[in-house]
Amino acid sequence: MVSSLNNLGVLLPIEGVIILVFVLSCFSLAIKRLYFSPLAKFPGPKLAALTMWYEFYYDVVKRGNYFRQIAKMHDQYGPVVRINPFELHVNDPTFYPILYSSSTKKRDKWSWAAGMFGNNTSVFSTVPHDHHRIRRAALNPLFSRTAIKQLEPTIKCQMHELSRRLDSFCESGMVLDLGLAFTVFAADVISAYCFGEPFGLLQDPDFAPEWVETVAAPSELGHLIKQFPWALGLFRLLPRSLIGVISPAIVRLYTIQEWMSLNVQSLISKRHDDHSSSAKSCVFEALLRSKLPASEKTVDRLKGEGQTLIGAGTLTTANVLKHVVFHTLDNPDRLHALAAELEAEFPDPNEDVSLDRLERLPLLTAYIKEALRLGYGVTHRLQLLADEPLHCNGMIIPPRTPVGMTSIFMHDDPTVFPNPREFDPDRWLGEVEDRRHLERCFVPFSKGTRMCLGMHLAWAEIYIVIATVFRSYSFQLHDTDRSHIEMAHDFFDPAPKLDSKGLRVTVQRK
């Protein structure tokens, strides 16, 4: 008994010292972040400057809602705000080309944010500017305007498959989620280009909803991965069944990574088995033939690239297609005007659409641009680090400071886009100088050296799909309003309200 009391007397002071050291450490860290950090001079909420838990609450607990809090910060503090202990956010259109520079100035990614999808081997997640330039250079020719023109038959092949599926709904009269159909269409296009064969998701009777959930899972999960990057490695040590109980989204992320590994490994094996030039040309075949060093051609490296290309080439394109269709169907005058332009250009209903001719149609282009504006592209802020000090609104941003901007704020700026929440294609049909002013704030694909690789592919898919469906079919919205398609959550990609039923329509052949 006496021995136990003596031990207790020893433990209590030790525990007290540990607690005291912890409290003093937290206090000193708080003082450093609030008053002695290089970012201490920048305005913003003290709690945001103090801890990353502030962002965690809004993006993880409140599920992709930090962008709304950042908007409130700008309303209160101005165009440059400190949104966490290490990062600044800017809401000033004139600063966009400075941050997302296309010049020779280097822009590294912020490593904390770059790995948010659980891989660090893709072009998207590459942190150093020079390393990114090497990886991007191998992909740029494959996604150039010229290369995508040559891909037009592949896009049309999948469009024919989508039309076949729409015809089946014409016959049955059943309601379909057109957004889901658009998602698997985009997935089949990008998979055909990446791997030489489409995934065949359009052939699934229900448009492969579980696959779509799997591909979308890393988007929301990214908020959690940023905060706890070590968690993915820890979860890999657990049985898959247990992980599924804790987080089904993590299981889906592991599934897609394993799936990409199998696809890449299969392509490499086929390439080794077929040394002739008859092997199908595709993105990964081209990467394997490229001058990239061997370290850039491993299965693990290309797996990460595949995950990014499939995800990026699927979700954002489908989102824009949903916006074009919904806003066109929601206004009979718009529907009539677009149909008239398409009929004038292609009077023969059996004539195949041509991408070259579609790109010259002003009204169709205006509809797509307005859908891109309201769809935002990527909604999450894209942080970059400059080697030099940056000047913004009379403030000097220290070198190597993570700085981000957001397409939402650019596209919703009422000084540039009057009535910004309205779908108004006419704004893109004004005078040349007026359109140039809009273009400067039009950033669905971002800008600079880190801009979206698949921009030309997305444009081509959207042109072909919209022209084809509105030439050949009549749609009726079914229990669908704007809230089912407009952005409500920032899961890196824009996501509608959580109980959205999608873009539900009935369809008939014209």
From Swiss-Prot:
InterPro entries associated with the record: Cyt_P450, Cyt_P450_CS, Cyt_P450_E_grp-I, Cyt_P450_sf, Cytochrome_P450_monoxygenase
EC number: 1.-.-.-
Cofactor(s) it depends on: heme
Transmembrane segments: 11-31
Keywords: Heme, Iron, Membrane, Metal-binding, Monooxygenase, Oxidoreductase, Transmembrane, Transmembrane helix
Topological category with respect to the lipid bilayer: Single-pass membrane protein
GO cellular component: membrane
GO terms assigned for molecular function: heme binding; iron ion binding; monooxygenase activity; oxidoreductase activity, acting on paired donors, with incorporation or reduction of molecular oxygen
Listed SUPFAM superfamilies: Cytochrome P450
Oxidoreductase keyword on record: yes
Superkingdom per UniProt: Eukaryota
Binding-site list for heme: C452
Principal subcellular localisation of the protein: membrane
Protein purpose: Tryptophan 6-hydroxylase; part of the fragmented gene cluster that mediates the biosynthesis of fusarochromene, a tryptophan-derived metabolite closely related to a group of mycotoxins including fusarochromanone. Within the pathway, fscE hydroxalates the first intermediate D-tryptophan to yield 6-hydroxytryptophan. The first step of the pathway is the epimerization of L-tryptophan to D-tryptophan in the presence of the NRPS-like tryptophan epimerase fscC. D-tryptophan is subsequently hydroxylated by the tryptophan 6-hydroxylase fscE to yield 6-hydroxytryptophan.
Similarity comment: family membership: Belongs to the cytochrome P450 family.
Record-given protein name: Tryptophan 6-hydroxylase fscE
